[in-house]
Amino acid sequence: ANMAVMECDLLFSIGTRFNDRFTGDLNEFAPHAQIVHIDVDTASISRNVVVDVPVVADAGVALEKLLEWAEKKDTAKWQEQIHRWEKENPLAMRRDRGISPQMIMEHINAQFPHSIYVTDVGQHQMWATQYLELDEQSQLITSGGLGTMGFGFPAAIGAKIANPKKSVVCITGDGGFQMNIQEMATAVTQG
């Protein structure tokens, strides 16, 4: 995905804030691209990345209109290039350097397949979104870029109440968990 962003000539961003976890170095982000940014919040557009085509609109409405006007293009060469990048640059996992985030997420996937995964705020949130392998039976619940430390554990409890037969895995850090550790007692007493 990073290679595709770096090499694309047109980038559609829908409801994205372009925060530093997404963009990296702003001076090097999508250097060849015309950027179209669709967001319902005027303040979010060109806030972090100056865009070429700002669209203030509901994403669903904007996409419906775009699809009415869009012409089908042959993207076979672009798709082939993306597949080459995936093969040439896989997410490498070094097993000779101790435990890595990829290994932890791989272990979570193996132990809890087809589960609901809930993240809190922090680096582990990035690890989960990058390294968990989700399928049609899995679900990822995250607060995104809202910075809501403490979201994970209560959200996991809510997910379990709503889906009592499904495994729910909360991926959190010490700060997020400590903000709501008392809810462990609530979960136990309320079943």
What are these regions (language model features)?
Residues M3-E7, V61, K65-E68, M103-A110, ...:
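Alpha-helical scaffold segments in soluble metabolic enzymes
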